[in-house]
């Protein structure tokens, strides 16, 4: 870590601590003195570099210095006993230049696996606070030197000029979040970018995102991870740790996502992307994985936390084995005071150094477990993040479950700060939209804000992040193209991935030339987007859904660094109708604040939200109900007139009739959107709507119609 302050444009933007300190000791030929104890990691000073790290169980710590790419250290500098205060070691080494070395640590101490103690001074250990990691500069290539799991840190001096960029602080409920994978978004040649698969490549797509109406991107893991971890070949195809949910270094951006291979440039390339996104009104939320690390279980490597303080950083069973609530071999001990401080430091680093706007916490329920794995009512780490002064305006989004069976959707400890991926929304809406019986009432509840899970009085309209799709599961196109998952190419005999995705192939498994099947699929995709963007709460969808990207039925593409996971941008032309519909619905959502939040009451005194299942103000449903109507009534953004929207969805396989509420004051219903309308390039989506009277409408089979009062 390092100290940061806002500097004028006239100053150099370099993270250097100016000091007139003089050496006090000489060890192994290096001039040294005690370092900056409150600044963990490597901190550049005007006359050297300070190195600070902590370990409770170690008896000795040694700093290892390497020439870039060298296999052996050129210097081993033990920390003098007087350079340790409590559990923290800190040493300022004079006259070393950041660009000319890489570093690591070794720790000596008891090696007693039965007690969870794994100290071994032969282990080369990565600094947990390292801001850059050496090694896999190019995707898919192992380092030529060192052991498979030997990572080293690089010292970073930043001179990036942010200008006047700051957090955008858009209201949470106004967000349309676009989840994407940095590499997969532009890696395919169809993306047309100059630097495919990189931060720079994603930057080239910002005009596209802005035109679509996106105001927040959620980046799948961008922390340093090892794509070669568990790499294997299946049927002649190289598989990788493609998604990146196996963190190596929490403070460092992933080096292989940088196009520019110059020393320490990955950070600036990421900053340039974030700055450009913000300049275009797009917030940046990053996916963080504090539930486990890439060190795995007892059979996994020891390259950092295990060798520094194994029984501090990880949850261990009474016989010193690793708990596995993550499903990935180990679990971080998030509510231990040391680990809690580490997590807070990390998130502050990304907020300050990279100016991100929020975080999505993978398997966040693990952060709510105590050191023995039991769920806590008020987990200290979650409370600390909710009230941290640096993170006070950050969006905090929880994936409110874990692989150990703890499911907290609607009950995640929030302090009115945390939002949640609403998995109930996904499941209930998928079931209703494909026509399952008994789901109408659930669908109404989900669309209107999931009040059974998130009280608007206590948690507002921001707690439920609504989504139909994410990286985990079918794409939206595949949701309506496959009844079964097709994960054979993952190499596990199709046993991996979710077996209950609530999908429906519309009559043919996979691709088909049947125009009726393809027409129905397109209509269901539009129905899904219409429901999502007319629902209370932030909306999120997976990148490529807006032009029907496919993973060919694979609903667990975590290892597929190929056309299965890469977006095929040629489909943008083929499915322009869907793209234009999504853009239309995002704009419609922006134009009608009543869809997103409570406004002032309408002058006509309609209730803010009312249900009309076939007839006005009929909120009753039964097992066979397939036609639902929801009316939102309030005031427009300027408070100059009423804002009244009627959402109508027929999930039945035959047309049904909807009677609309009578409008006062000379207003009339006008159709804005009809998912059954024939599409003509450049036209709207209102054609072929059959009005049977002033306040009666015929809703075609499996169709959404949206009306506004004018």
Task: Give the ranges of each region predicted by the language model.
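Carbohydrate-interacting/catalytic domains
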Residues: 2-178, 183, 204, 209, ...
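Short acidic/polar active-site loop segments enriched in Thr and Asp
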Residues: 59, 215-217, 357, 538-539
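Short catalytic/ligand-binding loop motif for oxyanion handling, primarily in non-cytosolic enzymes
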Residues: 100, 112-116, 186-188, 225-229, ...
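Core domains of carbohydrate- and sulfate-ester-processing enzymes
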Residues: 103, 107-164, 227-247, 252, ...
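Conserved alpha/beta catalytic core and glycan-binding cleft of carbohydrate-active enzymes
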Residues: 130-134, 355, 368-372, 377-543, ...
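Hydrophobic faces of well-ordered beta-strands that scaffold small-molecule active sites
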Residues: 176-178, 217, 284-286, 359, ...
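Substrate-binding/active-site clefts of carbohydrate-active enzymes
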Residues: 181-356, 363-390, 406, 453
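Generic recognition of stable, solvent-exposed alpha-helical segments in well-folded globular domains
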Residues: 201-204, 217-218, 265-272, 284, ...
């Amino acid at each position: 870590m390092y100290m940061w302050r806002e500097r004028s444009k006239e100053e150099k933007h370099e993270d250097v601590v100016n000091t007139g300190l003089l050496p006090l000791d000489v060890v192994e030929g290096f001039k040294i003195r005690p370092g900056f104890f409150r600044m963990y990691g490597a901190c550049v000073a005007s006359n050297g570099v300070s190195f600070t790290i902590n370990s409770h169980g170690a008896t000795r710590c040694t700093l290892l210095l390497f020439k870039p790419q060298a296999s052996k250290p050129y210097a081993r500098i033990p920390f003098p006993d007087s350079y340790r205060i409590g559990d923290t070691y800190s040493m300022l080494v004079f006259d070393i230049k950041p660009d000319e070395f890489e570093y690591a640590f070794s720790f000596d101490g008891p090696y007693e696996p039965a007690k969870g103690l794994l100290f071994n001074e032969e282990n080369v250990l990565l600094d947990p606070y390292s801001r850059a990691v050496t090694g896999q500069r190019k995707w898919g290539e192992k380092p030529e030197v060192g052991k498979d799991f030997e990572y080293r840190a690089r010292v970073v001096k930043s001179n990036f000029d942010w200008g006047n960029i700051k957090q955008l602080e858009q209201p949470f409920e106004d967000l349309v979040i676009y989840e994407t994978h940095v590499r997969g978004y532009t890696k395919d040649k169809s993306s047309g970018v100059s630097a495919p698969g990189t931060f720079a490549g994603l930057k080239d797509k910002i005009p596209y995102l802005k035109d679509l109406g996106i105001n927040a991107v959620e980046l799948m893991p961008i922390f340093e991870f090892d794509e070669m971890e568990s790499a294997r070949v299946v049927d002649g195809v190289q598989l990788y740790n493609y998604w990146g949910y196996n963190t190596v270094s929490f403070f460092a951006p992933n080096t292989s996502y940088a196009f520019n291979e110059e020393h320490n440039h990955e950070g600036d390339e990421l900053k340039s992307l974030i700055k450009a996104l913000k300049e275009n009104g797009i917030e940046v939320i990053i996916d963080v994985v504090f539930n486990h690390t890439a060190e795995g279980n007892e059979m996994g490597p020891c390259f950092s936390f295990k060798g520094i303080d194994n029984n501090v950083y990880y949850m261990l069973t009474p016989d010193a084995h690793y708990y596995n609530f993550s499903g990935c071999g180990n679990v971080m001990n998030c509510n231990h005071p040391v680990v809690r401080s580490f997590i807070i430091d990390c998130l502050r680093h990304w907020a300050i150094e990279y100016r991100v706007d929020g975080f999505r916490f993978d398997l966040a329920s693990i952060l709510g477990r105590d050191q023995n794995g039991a769920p806590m009512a008020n987990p200290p780490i979650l409370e600390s993040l909710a009230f941290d002064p640096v993170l006070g305006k950050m969006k905090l989004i929880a994936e409110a479950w874990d692989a150990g069976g703890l499911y907290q959707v609607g009950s995640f400890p929030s302090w009115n700060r945390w939002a949640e991926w609403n998995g109930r929304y996904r499941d209930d809406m998928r079931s209703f939209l494909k026509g399952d019986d008994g789901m109408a009432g659930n669908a109404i509840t989900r669309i209107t804000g999931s009040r059974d899970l998130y009280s608007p009085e206590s948690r507002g309209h921001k707690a439920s992040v609504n989504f139909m799709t994410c990286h985990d599961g079918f794409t939206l196109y595949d949701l309506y193209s496959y009844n079964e998952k097709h994960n054979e190419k993952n190499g596990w005999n199709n046993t991996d991935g979710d077996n209950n995705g609530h999908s429906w192939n519309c009559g043919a498994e996979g691709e088909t030339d049947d125009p009726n099947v393809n027409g129905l699929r397109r209509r269901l995709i539009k129905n899904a987007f219409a429901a999502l963007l007319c629902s209370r709460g932030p909306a999120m969808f997976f990148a490529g859904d807006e032009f029907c990207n496919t993973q060919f039925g694979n609903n667990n593409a975590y290892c597929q660094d190929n056309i299965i996971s890469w977006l095929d941008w040629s489909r943008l032309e083929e499915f322009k109708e869907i793209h234009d519909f999504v853009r239309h619905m995002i704009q419609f959502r922006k134009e009608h604040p009543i869809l997103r939040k409570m406004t002032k009451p309408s002058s006509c005194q309609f209730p803010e939200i009312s249900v009309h299942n076939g007839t006005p103000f009929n909120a009753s449903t039964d097992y066979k109900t397939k036609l639902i109507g929801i009316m939102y009534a309030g005031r427009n953004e300027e408070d100059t007139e009423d804002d009244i929207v009627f959402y109508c969805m027929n999930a039945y396989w035959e047309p049904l009739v909807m009677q609309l509420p009578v409008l006062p004051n000379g207003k009339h219903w006008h159709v804005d959107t009809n998912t059954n309308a024939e599409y003509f390039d450049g036209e709207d989506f209102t054609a072929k709507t059959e009005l049977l009277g002033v306040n009666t409408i015929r809703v075609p089979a499996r169709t959404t119609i949206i009306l506004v009062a004018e």
